[in-house]
Curated annotation (Swiss-Prot):
InterPro entries assigned: Histone_AcTrfase_su3
Family from the record: Belongs to the NGG1 family.
Pfam families found in the cross-reference section: Ada3
PTM sites of type Phosphoserine: 280, 298
Top-level taxonomy: Eukaryota, Metazoa, Chordata, Craniata, Vertebrata
The organism's place on the tree of life at top rank: Eukaryota
Quaternary structure (record): The PCAF complex is composed of a number of TBP-associated factors (TAFS), such as TAF5, TAF5L, TAF6, TAF6L, TAF9, TAF10 and TAF12, PCAF, and also PCAF-associated factors (PAFs), such as TADA2L/ADA2, TADA3L/ADA3 and SPT3. Interacts directly with TADA2L and PCAF and also with the high-risk HPV oncoprotein E6. Component of the STAGA transcription coactivator-HAT complex, at least composed of SUPT3H, GCN5L2, TAF5L, TAF6L, SUPT7L, TADA3L, TAD1L, TAF10, TAF12, TRRAP and TAF9. Component of the TFTC-HAT complex.
Entry protein name: Transcriptional adapter 3
Annotated coiled-coil segments of the chain: 40-69, 367-407
Length: 432
């Protein structure tokens, strides 16, 4: 029982952390399923709660380590004391058992006369041994609370926005104000290319020609004639396309009038919807008349195209007249002026880009002006700090002179007044 009373253990009572109160977000996340996951807005709260749990766990761990160290030291000290006790009994009980120490005592008395007793040197020799086994109780290490680094991280993130403006930052602003070399490239409108139908027709024709050339090459290989692939040139493709367009422009009925003339006549002639020509009765012609007209309406004459002179000039004249009246747009206008949805949207975005660039340039000019003003103020604030140091030095000199019970010299007073006036002038410049 005495050993238990002498035990230095404190038996700390560890209080468990209430997760529902201290860590509600952590408890809610644990209660979720794996499919729900964790949101980005919850990470900061989770970090703080996990730091709280880590600090409490480390606190308990340090207290347990301290208790373990105390118990180990106590056991070592207890064993050393038992060893010391046995050593003392052995040293004190050894002289009566052996005869040699008595002879040494007699020789010492006969040779040296009265002197210090024989037991005193032994006591001197035992004292250092006792000092070797002396132990001092180490104080219990109080567990240190882990350092909260959140304020330091916060001020480190805020410092760049509150620090003094440097000359490099001003130089960066000046470089940003320089117009970029490729600024004009953003406002160029690319020329209008070929229509997609023409481009696709050209690509399809090229593809067909390549396939035909490959098929011909395969046939030549079968016959034993090895020849290179013949690819159609782009100019040949354009010539073929123009030829096909010219062929398609000619109507099947062989009408010599142009497309514009036909459209104009179709717009002017009223169509008889009630009685179409297919249902209209065909009048009977007499045999003579039919015989006379038979030569003109023979099948051989129907295949020949109907020829009318000056159809091209008529087509161009009608076109000019319609353009003059404003009923038809001129095709001589450059392609850049042709308005379409893509061009309108492109010009709209270019106008927005110009307005935004002008706004940004204005703000950069204002920012550069404010930065230069702030740099000059920083220099004044630096001069104020230097003036404050000079004023404090003059004040210390005057106070040292008063402590020594001597009046300050005229030089010291003049220096103090001079530094004060300089400081006031700098403050006026800073406030102005």
């Amino acid at each position: 029982m005495s050993e238990l009373k002498d035990c230095p253990l404190q038996f700390h009572d560890f209080k468990s952390v209430d997760h529902l109160k201290v860590c509600p977000r952590y408890t809610a996340v644990l209660a979720r399923s794996e499919d729900d996951g964790i949101g980005i807005e919850e990470l900061d709260t989770l970090q703080l709660e996990l730091e709280t749990l880590l600090s409490s766990a480390s606190r308990r761990l340090r207290v347990l380590e301290a208790e373990t160290q105390i118990l180990t030291d106590w056991q070592d000290k207890k064993g050393d004391r038992r060893f010391l006790k046995l050593g003392r009994d052995h040293e004190l009980g050894a002289p009566p058992k052996h005869g040699k120490p008595k002879k040494q005592k007699l020789e010492g008395k006969a040779g040296h006369g009265p002197g210090p007793g024989p037991g005193r040197p032994k006591s001197k020799n035992l004292q250092p041994k006792i000092q070797e086994y002396e132990f001092t109780d180490d104080p219990i290490d109080v567990p240190r609370i882990p350092k909260n680094d959140a304020p330091n991280r916060f001020w480190a993130s805020v410092e760049p926005y509150c620090a003094d403006i440097t000359s490099e930052e001003v130089r960066t602003l000046e470089e940003l104000l320089k117009p970029p070399e490729d600024e004009a490239e953003h406002y160029k409108i690319p020329p209008l290319g070929k229509h997609y139908s023409q481009r696709w027709a050209q690509e399809d024709l090229l593809e067909e020609q390549k396939d035909g050339a490959r098929a011909a090459a395969v046939a030549d290989k079968k016959k034993g004639l090895m020849g290179p692939l013949t690819e159609l040139d782009t100019k040949d493709v354009d010539a073929l396309l123009k030829k096909s367009e010219a062929q398609h422009e000619q109507p099947e009925d062989g009408c010599p009038f142009g497309a514009l003339t036909q459209r104009l006549l179709q717009a002017l002639v009223e169509e008889n919807i009630i009685s179409p020509m297919e249902d209209s009765p065909i009048p009977d012609m007499s045999g003579k008349e039919s015989g006379a007209d038979g030569a003109s309406t023979s099948p051989r004459n129907q295949n020949k195209p109907f020829s009318v002179p000056h159809t091209k000039s008529l087509e161009s004249r009608i076109k000019e007249e319609l353009i003059a009246q404003g009923l038809l747009e001129s095709e001589d206008r450059p392609a850049e002026d042709s308005e379409d949805e893509v061009l309108a949207e492109l010009r709209k975005r270019q106008a927005e880009l110009k307005a935004l660039s002008a706004h940004n340039r204005t703000k950069k000019h204002d920012l550069l002006r404010l930065a230069k003003e702030e740099v000059s103020r920083q220099e004044l604030r630096q001069r104020v700090r230097m003036a404050d140091n000079e004023v404090m030095d003059a004040f210390r000199k005057i106070m040292a002179a008063r402590q020594k019970k001597r009046t300050p010299t005229k030089k010291e007073k003049d220096q103090a007044w001079k530094t004060l006036k300089e400081r006031e002038s700098i403050l006026k410049l800073l406030d102005g």
